């Protein structure tokens, strides 16, 4: 559970770390949309190269980011299996009443690849952006909506805290599982339904710890006289540079290349 990378931050001074947080948020959003627009394997060659390039520039190894997929293996396998057996088409192999089709195999592999790129791509945002910078970036992007009554700072703070709590909750789950296994609990044996039922006793202590951490955070913010974004100043002002412009251009080329690939190959 502790291996999940979404929500974690690795300090650094790479060119990716130094990018304006608004740039990284917008590029990540565009990257996610692009993954759902692409509908063939050739188009995914460009996002794959993009992820590898960002990994090299950020100094965060691709192997480390792939570790974040381990807690989600069940979801990835389930996605593949559902597509494999549910999509009708040219039959490759029969397993009783179930048919494995060419179209199902193609779509299952395609969806797994999309899911992996989605997880790894979004992980890069939090891995290279500090919580403060992420909050400032989201708040700045939401600032125009203040005119219609949207609390930009509060919403940005909520989103950032939610992201940062993901690895914390995963760590809490891991600790509770180990404590219960030491007392004889078995989470590994049995069928899928039995394993799911064995996880129910984890929920009560997990929610109690989550509420306790949330209460501690609220008390810490209250003791520091936190009053939202009212009259709040920043030590570092957000300012885009030529590196941000280059990042936007690279993302634009990525989008064009991915979409045009269907007409080339």
Swiss-Prot record:
The keyword Transport applies. GO terms for molecular function: transmembrane transporter activity. It is a multi-pass membrane protein. The keyword Flavoprotein does not apply. Keywords: Cell membrane, Membrane, Transmembrane, Transmembrane helix, Transport. CDD domains: EcfT (cd16914). InterPro entries: ABC/ECF_trnsptr_transmembrane (IPR003339), ECF_transporter_component (IPR051611), EcfT (IPR024919). Its main location: membrane. One of its GO terms (cellular component) is plasma membrane. It is found in: Cell membrane. It holds the Pfam family CbiQ. It comes from the Bacteria. The chain crosses the membrane at residues 32-52, 72-92, 115-135, 150-170, 245-265. PANTHER family: SLL0384 PROTEIN. Transmembrane (T) component of an energy-coupling factor (ECF) ABC-transporter complex. Unlike classic ABC transporters this ECF transporter provides the energy necessary to transport a number of different substrates. Belongs to the energy-coupling factor EcfT family. Forms a stable energy-coupling factor (ECF) transporter complex composed of 2 membrane-embedded substrate-binding proteins (S component), 2 ATP-binding proteins (A component) and 2 transmembrane proteins (T component). May be able to interact with more than 1 S component at a time. This is Energy-coupling factor transporter transmembrane protein EcfT. It comes from Thermosediminibacter oceani (strain ATCC BAA-1034 / DSM 16646 / JW/IW-1228P).
């Amino acid at each position: 559970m502790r291996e999940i990378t979404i929500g974690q931050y690795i300090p650094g001074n790479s060119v990716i770390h130094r990018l304006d947080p608004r740039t990284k948020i917008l590029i990540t959003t565009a990257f996610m949309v692009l993954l759902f627009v692409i509908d063939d394997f050739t188009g995914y060659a460009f996002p794959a190269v993009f992820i590898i390039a960002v990994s090299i520039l950020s100094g965060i190894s691709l192997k480390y980011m792939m570790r974040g997929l381990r807690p989600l293996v069940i979801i990835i396998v389930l996605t593949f299996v559902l597509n494999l057996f549910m999509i009708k088409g040219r039959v490759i192999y029969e397993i009783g009443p179930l048919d494995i089709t060419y179209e199902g195999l193609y779509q299952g592999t395609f969806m797994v690849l999309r899911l992996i790129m989605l997880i790894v791509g979004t992980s890069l945002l939090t891995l290279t952006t500090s919580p403060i910078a992420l909050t400032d970036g989201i708040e700045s992007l939401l600032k125009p909506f203040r005119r219609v009554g949207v609390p930009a700072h509060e919403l940005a703070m909520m989103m950032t805290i939610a992201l940062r709590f993901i690895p914390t909750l995963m760590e809490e789950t891991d600790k509770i599982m180990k404590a219960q296994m030491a007392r004889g609990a078995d989470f590994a044996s049995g069928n899928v339904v039995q394993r799911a039922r064995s996880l129910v006793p984890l929920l009560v202590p997990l929610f109690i710890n989550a509420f306790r951490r949330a209460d501690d955070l609220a008390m810490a913010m209250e003791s520091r006289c936190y009053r939202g974004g009212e009259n709040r100043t920043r030590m570092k002002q957000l300012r885009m540079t030529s590196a941000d412009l280059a990042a936007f251009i690279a993302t634009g080329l990525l989008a064009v290349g991915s979409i045009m690939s269907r007409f080339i190959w």
